[in-house]
Amino acid sequence: MTMYATMTTLALTSLIPPILGALINPNKKNSYPHYVKSIIASTFIISLFPTTMFMCLDQETIISNWHWATTQTTQLSLSFKLDYFSMTFIPVALFVTWSIMEFSLWYMDSDPNINQFFKYLLIFLITMLILVTANNLFQLFIGWEGVGIMSFLLISWWYARTDANTAAIQAILYNRIGDIGFVLALAWFLLHSNSWDPQQMILLSTNTDLTPLLGFLLAAAGKSAQLGLHPWLPSAMEGPTPVSALLHSSTMVVAGIFLLIRFYPLAENNPLIQTLTLCLGAITTLFAAVCALTQNDIKKIVAFSTSSQLGLMMVTIGINQPHLAFLHICTHAFFKAMLFMCSGSIIHNLNNEQDIRKMGGLLKTMPLTSTSLTIGSLALAGMPFLTGFYSKDLIIETANMSYTNAWALSITLIATSLTSAYSTRMILLTLTGQPRFPTLTNINENNPTLLNPIKRLTIGSLFAGFLITNNILPMSTPQVTIPLYLKLTALGVTSLGLLTALDLNYLTSKLKMKSPLYTFHFSNMLGFYPNIMHRSIPYLGLLTSQNLPLLLLDLTWLEKLLPKTISQYQISASITTSTQKGMIKLYFLSFFFPLILTLLLIT
């Protein structure tokens, strides 16, 4: 075992004592959240050393010591893979989680169960690190299900709210659909490869192995909220803001993308899977960007921006560039966590107001939050030399140089322009203009537990992209050899979106209210997908379920077959077989008519 492998194992093992302490002593002291935050900060600092050593040595390591189970055909062991993906992702995840933990000290200060909240966040992080470092498909599945169940517990944290419970159930149901694909791939590889080790799976795979790849794609679509399985992502905003920040930056939603990145050698020579991934990602990134344009909830705007960026990562995998997709995961984590934390700061200071139409003028009252929100939005839009630029620019350049994706490239460029548009709209409505919130609102952002994490992530949003791209292997960004007009494409579409948003804001600032267009309803109602899937189809199912028993059981069984039918048959049979009516008095009276007639005739 190499030195950096030992140090990485030590760093990750240090996350376990807080969990064990919480299990042994449930009645924890008030210092438990600070203890967890300090542990994660220390783990982040320790993890920098093995990551630096890995960059210098460029030597992958697999740790496999403990055998779980052995059958007649398969040996299942606990195995960790420390390669480029895991060694780069671990410090990023720890840094972002450290900032979110410190932010939670301020945001969740009045929550009576804050100790349990921090324990859940820590388990959430550990399950994601298990997923990232797993060198075994079953072990990866444990991390996969771990982030799923922890997201359910954290989204429904405020369990007294009906919307939070509904959102949590929605998240777990949509992820169960994706898990069907994962279990299908698990069973297929065990049947055909007799192993869950990625090395053996890749060695024995052929280009015709379509079934497990479709399973992986379905799993990634469910976990990373691609079109069709996306409604749980904006609904997850019902959870606390620190949960949204951790969920969208470095844990659950990128797990699906990471699954495809980890097993990209299986799909890189399969054109059908590449095409499906490319098309799914392109449609998702455009649909999410269109939906974000008309949202008024600040957290949902950021949530749809996450969905759009996940679609962009899928596009990158679809053009066979998994390393670029991973780079975008790492850069995206910094500014996305910061955007959610800035949103949480604004919401908390405005007494839980999330409608951007009721904000405005926050630039002067909340200067640090406003500055960080602007930097994060510009990084999201791909502004040059911010963190997001280093990955988005390379993705668009690579897509430009690919000759098989003109349709997907066009959609991706449109979505990139829309990203700039809704980011600018959020900045203008939230930070500029006249204040539209109650005048007695007490705004205060002087708490260090609020300022320090936002400052750290702001620095990350400024410089992390430069540091990561200049320290990955190869040690520097390759020289670009494409024409100038293609190189300027990313900047061009970003500028186009910015100008579009400014122009729309200027044109519509003093207009009278008109009835919205159908396109506005399409965007604002999320493409009518929730109404169709969550209202119309369940209503149709309930109506059908009601009518079938009513018609089949009540009407047919009761009226056509048994009691009423028997009585009808008896009445019909009695009428048919006899003319007797049972009228005894009438029968006796009929005997007197002939007698009376006879007497009359005689006389």
From Swiss-Prot:
It is a multi-pass membrane protein. Keywords: Electron transport, Membrane, Mitochondrion, Mitochondrion inner membrane, NAD, Respiratory chain, Translocase, Transmembrane, Transmembrane helix, Transport, Ubiquinone. It comes from the Eukaryota. GO terms for molecular function: NADH dehydrogenase (ubiquinone) activity. Its EC number is 7.1.1.2. It catalyses: a ubiquinone + NADH + 5 H(+)(in) = a ubiquinol + NAD(+) + 4 H(+)(out). One of its GO terms (cellular component) is respiratory chain complex I. The chain crosses the membrane at residues 4-24, 38-58, 87-107, 122-142, 144-160, 171-191, 211-233, 241-261, 272-292, 301-320, 325-347, 370-390, 405-422, 457-477, 482-502, 582-602. Pfam families: NADH5_C, Proton_antipo_M, Proton_antipo_N. InterPro entries: NADH_DH_su5_C, NADHpl_OxRdtase_5_subgr, ND/Mrp_TM, NU5C-like, Proton_antipo_N. It is found in: Mitochondrion inner membrane. One of its GO terms (biological process) is electron transport coupled proton transport. Belongs to the complex I subunit 5 family. Core subunit of respiratory chain NADH dehydrogenase (Complex I) which is composed of 45 different subunits. Core subunit of the mitochondrial membrane respiratory chain NADH dehydrogenase (Complex I) which catalyzes electron transfer from NADH through the respiratory chain, using ubiquinone as an electron acceptor. Essential for the catalytic activity and assembly of complex I. This is NADH-ubiquinone oxidoreductase chain 5. The gene is MT-ND5.
